[in-house]
Protein backbone atom coordinates (compact mmCIF):
# COMPACT_ATOMS: atom_id res chain seq x y z
CA UNK A 1 0.00 0.00 0.00
CA UNK A 2 1.32 3.46 -0.84
CA UNK A 3 2.03 5.82 2.03
CA UNK A 4 -0.64 8.48 2.66
CA UNK A 5 0.60 11.96 1.75
CA UNK A 6 -0.76 15.31 2.85
CA UNK A 7 0.28 18.92 2.85
CA UNK A 8 -0.36 22.52 1.98
CA UNK A 9 -0.18 24.02 -1.50
CA UNK A 10 -0.44 27.67 -2.42
CA UNK A 11 -1.08 29.11 -5.89
CA UNK A 12 0.49 32.51 -6.51
CA UNK A 13 0.74 34.88 -9.42
CA UNK A 14 -0.31 38.26 -10.67
CA UNK A 15 -3.95 39.18 -10.10
CA UNK A 16 -6.31 37.44 -12.53
CA UNK A 17 -4.03 34.56 -13.57
CA UNK A 18 -6.64 31.89 -12.81
CA UNK A 19 -5.61 30.95 -9.25
CA UNK A 20 -9.10 30.86 -7.72
CA UNK A 21 -10.62 29.10 -10.75
CA UNK A 22 -7.89 26.46 -10.46
CA UNK A 23 -8.60 26.00 -6.73
CA UNK A 24 -12.31 25.51 -7.43
CA UNK A 25 -11.62 23.07 -10.29
CA UNK A 26 -9.34 20.88 -8.16
CA UNK A 27 -11.68 20.88 -5.15
CA UNK A 28 -14.74 20.32 -7.34
CA UNK A 29 -16.87 22.96 -5.63
CA UNK A 30 -16.78 26.72 -5.43
CA UNK A 31 -14.73 27.72 -2.38
CA UNK A 32 -12.78 30.71 -3.73
CA UNK A 33 -14.32 33.86 -5.19
CA UNK A 34 -13.60 34.21 -8.92
CA UNK A 35 -14.04 37.47 -10.78
CA UNK A 36 -12.31 39.13 -13.69
CA UNK A 37 -11.40 42.02 -11.39
CA UNK A 38 -7.88 41.84 -9.93
CA UNK A 39 -7.41 41.55 -6.15
CA UNK A 40 -10.78 39.99 -5.39
CA UNK A 41 -9.53 37.23 -3.09
CA UNK A 42 -9.03 38.60 0.39
CA UNK A 43 -9.03 35.75 2.87
CA UNK A 44 -6.81 32.69 2.87
CA UNK A 45 -9.38 30.07 1.93
CA UNK A 46 -8.30 26.49 2.19
CA UNK A 47 -9.84 24.23 -0.41
CA UNK A 48 -9.38 20.55 0.33
CA UNK A 49 -8.74 17.85 -2.30
CA UNK A 50 -9.43 14.33 -0.94
CA UNK A 51 -8.38 11.05 -2.50
CA UNK A 52 -7.80 7.56 -1.09
CA UNK A 53 -4.05 8.03 -0.67
CA UNK A 54 -3.56 11.79 -0.30
CA UNK A 55 -5.02 15.07 0.88
CA UNK A 56 -4.02 18.43 -0.63
CA UNK A 57 -4.99 21.56 1.27
CA UNK A 58 -5.08 24.49 -1.15
CA UNK A 59 -4.40 27.86 0.37
CA UNK A 60 -5.89 30.67 -1.69
CA UNK A 61 -4.17 34.04 -1.40
CA UNK A 62 -4.72 37.49 -2.90
CA UNK A 63 -2.54 38.25 -5.94
CA UNK A 64 0.77 39.81 -4.90
CA UNK A 65 1.08 43.42 -5.98
CA UNK A 66 2.87 46.59 -4.97
CA UNK A 67 0.57 47.95 -2.24
CA UNK A 68 -1.06 51.38 -2.51
CA UNK A 69 -3.19 51.31 0.63
CA UNK A 70 -3.07 49.91 4.14
CA UNK A 71 -5.42 47.13 2.99
CA UNK A 72 -3.05 46.33 0.12
CA UNK A 73 -0.15 46.13 2.59
CA UNK A 74 -2.10 43.82 4.92
CA UNK A 75 -3.06 41.57 2.01
CA UNK A 76 0.57 41.36 0.89
CA UNK A 77 1.72 40.49 4.44
CA UNK A 78 -0.87 37.71 4.50
CA UNK A 79 0.51 36.33 1.23
CA UNK A 80 4.11 36.38 2.44
CA UNK A 81 3.20 34.62 5.71
CA UNK A 82 1.47 31.92 3.69
CA UNK A 83 4.50 31.37 1.41
CA UNK A 84 6.80 30.37 4.22
CA UNK A 85 4.34 27.89 5.76
CA UNK A 86 3.34 25.72 2.77
CA UNK A 87 4.91 22.58 1.26
CA UNK A 88 4.56 23.56 -2.40
CA UNK A 89 4.09 26.88 -4.19
CA UNK A 90 2.55 26.82 -7.67
CA UNK A 91 3.28 29.97 -9.64
CA UNK A 92 0.45 30.62 -12.11
CA UNK A 93 1.21 32.31 -15.42
CA UNK A 94 -1.54 32.46 -18.08
CA UNK A 95 -0.84 31.05 -21.55
CA UNK A 96 -2.49 34.02 -23.24
CA UNK A 97 -0.28 36.80 -21.80
CA UNK A 98 3.43 37.40 -22.25
CA UNK A 99 5.60 37.18 -19.14
CA UNK A 100 6.15 40.70 -17.82
CA UNK A 101 7.89 42.62 -15.03
CA UNK A 102 5.04 41.73 -12.63
CA UNK A 103 5.75 38.00 -13.02
CA UNK A 104 9.49 38.51 -12.53
CA UNK A 105 8.85 40.60 -9.41
CA UNK A 106 6.61 37.89 -7.93
CA UNK A 107 9.15 35.17 -8.71
CA UNK A 108 11.83 37.20 -6.90
CA UNK A 109 9.50 37.80 -3.94
CA UNK A 110 8.75 34.07 -3.60
CA UNK A 111 12.39 33.16 -3.75
CA UNK A 112 13.29 35.87 -1.20
CA UNK A 113 10.58 34.86 1.30
CA UNK A 114 10.61 31.08 0.81
CA UNK A 115 13.92 30.08 -0.80
CA UNK A 116 13.64 26.41 0.21
CA UNK A 117 9.97 25.76 -0.55
CA UNK A 118 9.32 23.57 -3.63
CA UNK A 119 8.22 25.84 -6.48
CA UNK A 120 6.48 24.60 -9.63
CA UNK A 121 5.33 26.58 -12.67
CA UNK A 122 1.69 26.33 -13.80
CA UNK A 123 0.76 27.67 -17.23
CA UNK A 124 -2.99 28.37 -16.95
CA UNK A 125 -5.77 29.04 -19.49
CA UNK A 126 -4.27 26.75 -22.16
CA UNK A 127 -7.74 26.36 -23.69
CA UNK A 128 -7.53 29.99 -24.84
CA UNK A 129 -4.56 29.68 -27.20
CA UNK A 130 -3.28 27.30 -29.93
CA UNK A 131 -0.80 24.55 -29.00
CA UNK A 132 2.25 26.38 -30.39
CA UNK A 133 1.51 29.38 -28.13
CA UNK A 134 1.35 27.02 -25.14
CA UNK A 135 4.73 25.51 -26.12
CA UNK A 136 6.28 28.99 -26.45
CA UNK A 137 4.92 29.99 -23.03
CA UNK A 138 6.30 26.81 -21.40
CA UNK A 139 9.71 27.75 -22.77
CA UNK A 140 9.39 31.33 -21.49
CA UNK A 141 8.38 30.13 -18.01
CA UNK A 142 11.32 27.74 -17.96
CA UNK A 143 13.63 30.67 -18.78
CA UNK A 144 12.12 32.61 -15.85
CA UNK A 145 12.24 29.77 -13.32
CA UNK A 146 15.33 27.88 -14.45
CA UNK A 147 15.88 24.65 -16.41
CA UNK A 148 15.23 22.34 -13.42
CA UNK A 149 11.79 23.74 -12.59
CA UNK A 150 8.80 21.46 -13.10
CA UNK A 151 6.19 23.21 -15.30
CA UNK A 152 2.65 21.97 -15.95
CA UNK A 153 0.22 23.42 -18.53
CA UNK A 154 -3.48 23.25 -17.46
CA UNK A 155 -6.96 24.51 -18.20
CA UNK A 156 -9.15 24.80 -15.10
CA UNK A 157 -12.15 25.56 -17.34
CA UNK A 158 -11.94 22.48 -19.59
CA UNK A 159 -10.24 20.27 -16.98
CA UNK A 160 -7.36 19.46 -19.34
CA UNK A 161 -4.22 18.28 -17.48
CA UNK A 162 -5.77 18.76 -14.01
CA UNK A 163 -4.96 15.13 -13.14
CA UNK A 164 -1.34 15.67 -14.23
CA UNK A 165 -1.07 18.77 -12.02
CA UNK A 166 -2.61 16.88 -9.08
CA UNK A 167 -0.05 14.07 -9.44
CA UNK A 168 2.85 16.53 -9.61
CA UNK A 169 1.61 18.33 -6.46
CA UNK A 170 1.12 15.06 -4.55
CA UNK A 171 4.60 13.83 -5.51
CA UNK A 172 6.06 16.86 -3.69
CA UNK A 173 4.06 16.41 -0.46
CA UNK A 174 5.49 14.68 2.62
CA UNK A 175 3.93 11.55 4.13
CA UNK A 176 1.40 12.68 6.73
CA UNK A 177 -2.11 12.38 8.16
CA UNK A 178 -5.40 13.60 6.71
CA UNK A 179 -5.80 17.02 8.34
CA UNK A 180 -9.51 17.22 7.58
CA UNK A 181 -12.31 14.63 7.62
CA UNK A 182 -13.35 13.14 4.28
CA UNK A 183 -16.10 15.19 2.62
CA UNK A 184 -15.01 18.52 4.09
CA UNK A 185 -14.09 20.89 1.26
CA UNK A 186 -13.01 24.03 3.11
CA UNK A 187 -12.35 25.14 6.68
CA UNK A 188 -13.81 28.61 6.12
CA UNK A 189 -16.89 29.27 8.27
CA UNK A 190 -20.10 29.45 6.25
CA UNK A 191 -20.57 33.15 7.03
CA UNK A 192 -17.22 34.01 5.44
CA UNK A 193 -18.16 32.02 2.33
CA UNK A 194 -21.60 33.70 2.19
CA UNK A 195 -19.99 37.14 2.39
CA UNK A 196 -17.56 36.18 -0.40
CA UNK A 197 -20.42 34.94 -2.63
CA UNK A 198 -22.32 38.21 -2.13
CA UNK A 199 -19.14 40.16 -2.88
CA UNK A 200 -18.56 38.16 -6.05
CA UNK A 201 -22.12 38.83 -7.27
CA UNK A 202 -21.76 42.55 -6.49
CA UNK A 203 -18.46 42.79 -8.44
CA UNK A 204 -19.83 41.14 -11.57
CA UNK A 205 -19.81 43.59 -14.48
CA UNK A 206 -19.16 46.82 -12.59
CA UNK A 207 -16.60 49.50 -13.27
CA UNK A 208 -13.01 49.10 -12.16
CA UNK A 209 -13.23 51.59 -9.31
CA UNK A 210 -15.35 49.32 -7.16
CA UNK A 211 -13.58 46.03 -6.31
CA UNK A 212 -11.24 47.18 -3.57
CA UNK A 213 -13.82 49.57 -2.14
CA UNK A 214 -16.40 46.86 -1.46
CA UNK A 215 -16.54 44.84 1.76
CA UNK A 216 -19.38 42.55 2.83
CA UNK A 217 -20.29 41.74 6.42
CA UNK A 218 -22.90 39.15 7.40
CA UNK A 219 -25.02 40.85 10.04
CA UNK A 220 -27.29 37.98 11.06
CA UNK A 221 -28.19 34.44 10.02
CA UNK A 222 -31.29 32.84 11.54
CA UNK A 223 -33.77 30.05 10.95
CA UNK A 224 -37.23 31.40 9.97
CA UNK A 225 -39.46 30.72 13.01
CA UNK A 226 -42.42 29.17 11.25
CA UNK A 227 -40.44 27.29 8.56
CA UNK A 228 -37.78 24.58 8.83
CA UNK A 229 -36.73 24.95 5.21
CA UNK A 230 -35.92 28.69 5.16
CA UNK A 231 -32.92 30.61 6.48
CA UNK A 232 -32.84 34.42 6.74
CA UNK A 233 -29.50 36.02 5.88
CA UNK A 234 -28.98 39.75 6.50
CA UNK A 235 -25.85 41.31 5.01
CA UNK A 236 -24.35 44.78 4.72
CA UNK A 237 -22.29 45.89 1.72
CA UNK A 238 -19.84 48.63 2.68
CA UNK A 239 -18.49 51.09 0.11
CA UNK A 240 -16.26 54.14 0.57
CA UNK A 241 -18.20 56.86 -1.26
CA UNK A 242 -21.73 57.96 -2.11
CA UNK A 243 -21.08 57.55 -5.85
CA UNK A 244 -20.13 53.90 -5.27
CA UNK A 245 -23.33 53.33 -3.32
CA UNK A 246 -25.23 54.39 -6.44
CA UNK A 247 -23.28 51.92 -8.58
CA UNK A 248 -24.05 49.01 -6.24
CA UNK A 249 -27.75 49.83 -5.87
CA UNK A 250 -28.41 50.78 -9.51
CA UNK A 251 -31.38 52.63 -10.97
CA UNK A 252 -34.41 52.13 -8.73
CA UNK A 253 -32.54 49.37 -6.87
CA UNK A 254 -32.41 47.18 -10.01
CA UNK A 255 -28.74 46.25 -9.71
CA UNK A 256 -28.95 45.35 -6.02
CA UNK A 257 -31.90 43.07 -6.80
CA UNK A 258 -29.82 41.31 -9.49
CA UNK A 259 -26.93 40.93 -7.04
CA UNK A 260 -29.33 39.54 -4.44
CA UNK A 261 -30.78 36.96 -6.83
CA UNK A 262 -27.36 35.76 -8.06
CA UNK A 263 -25.90 35.58 -4.53
CA UNK A 264 -29.00 33.88 -3.10
CA UNK A 265 -28.76 31.04 -5.65
CA UNK A 266 -25.10 30.42 -4.73
CA UNK A 267 -25.81 30.61 -0.97
CA UNK A 268 -28.69 28.14 -1.34
CA UNK A 269 -26.26 25.74 -3.05
CA UNK A 270 -23.77 26.23 -0.21
CA UNK A 271 -26.30 25.69 2.59
CA UNK A 272 -28.52 23.17 0.83
CA UNK A 273 -31.69 25.01 1.84
CA UNK A 274 -33.91 27.91 0.75
CA UNK A 275 -32.61 31.35 1.69
CA UNK A 276 -34.18 34.78 2.13
CA UNK A 277 -31.38 37.28 1.50
CA UNK A 278 -31.64 40.86 2.72
CA UNK A 279 -28.95 43.25 1.44
CA UNK A 280 -28.26 46.78 2.62
CA UNK A 281 -25.60 49.20 1.39
CA UNK A 282 -23.73 51.52 3.77
CA UNK A 283 -20.82 53.95 3.46
CA UNK A 284 -17.65 53.53 5.55
CA UNK A 285 -15.48 56.45 4.40
CA UNK A 286 -11.97 55.46 3.21
CA UNK A 287 -12.10 52.17 5.12
CA UNK A 288 -9.10 50.77 3.23
CA UNK A 289 -6.79 53.35 4.80
CA UNK A 290 -8.26 53.33 8.30
CA UNK A 291 -6.89 50.68 10.72
CA UNK A 292 -10.01 50.87 12.95
CA UNK A 293 -12.41 50.31 10.05
CA UNK A 294 -10.20 47.54 8.63
CA UNK A 295 -10.39 45.75 11.97
CA UNK A 296 -14.15 46.15 12.13
CA UNK A 297 -14.55 44.70 8.62
CA UNK A 298 -12.42 41.67 9.47
CA UNK A 299 -8.96 42.53 8.10
Swiss-Prot record:
PROSITE patterns named in the record: G_ERA (PS51713), KH_TYPE_2 (PS50823)
Pfam families per record: KH_2 (PF07650), MMR_HSR1 (PF01926)
Entry-linked CDD domains: Era, KH-II_Era
Location(s) in or outside the cell: Cell envelope; Secreted, Cell wall
Name of the protein: GTPase Era
Region (G5): 154-156
One GO-annotated biological process of the protein: ribosomal small subunit assembly
Superkingdom to which the source organism belongs: Bacteria
Domain spans labelled KH type-2: 206-285
Region of interest: G3: 60-63
Stored NCBIfam families: era (TIGR00436), PRK00089.1 (NF000908), small_GTP (TIGR00231)
Region of interest called G2, as start-end residue ranges on this chain: 39-43
GO-annotated molecular function: GTP binding; GTPase activity; ribosomal small subunit binding; rRNA binding
All residue ranges annotated as the Era-type G domain in the record: 5-175
Amino acid sequence: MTEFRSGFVCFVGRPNTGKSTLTNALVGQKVAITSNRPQTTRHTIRGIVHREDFQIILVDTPGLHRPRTLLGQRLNDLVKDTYSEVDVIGMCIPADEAIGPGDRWIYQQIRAVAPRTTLIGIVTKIDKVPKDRVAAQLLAVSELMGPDAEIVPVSATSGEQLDVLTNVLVSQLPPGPAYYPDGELTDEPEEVLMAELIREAALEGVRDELPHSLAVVIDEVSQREDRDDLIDVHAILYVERDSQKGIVIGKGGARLREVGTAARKQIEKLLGTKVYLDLRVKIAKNWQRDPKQLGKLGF
